[in-house]
């Protein structure tokens, strides 16, 4: 991997793993609920691709800040880390939501109940 100051490629790999896990669980959820549609699959893949693109853009900006003086002020900001943490939080909440949808018995458990469809609709 290329060395870019401030960019953790381990973080990128972890977030990509979360994206794949969310995708697999989302497909499983669709099959379990009988609502599998290729249009939803394409929309979900586009969303995942956009997350990856935003992370790569943040890494590119961090690299650009080290070689192009007009944007050197960006070099002090942890852009990639902030974006990666944000995407990871979105993916983790989606993974938990998919798990609860696949196994509705979890919806009554104290922690998992926050991620059930009923809890989301009541907010």
How should each PLM-predicted stretch be described?
Residues 73, 87-123:
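Membrane-proximal cytosolic segments adjacent to transmembrane helices
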Residues 14-40:
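Membrane-interface helix-loop junction between the first two transmembrane segments
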Residues 15-25, 51-59, 83-94:
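Alpha-helical transmembrane segments of multi-pass membrane proteins
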Residues 36-51:
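Juxtamembrane helix-capping/reentrant segments at transmembrane boundaries
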Residues 1-9:
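Short, strongly hydrophobic alpha-helical membrane anchors
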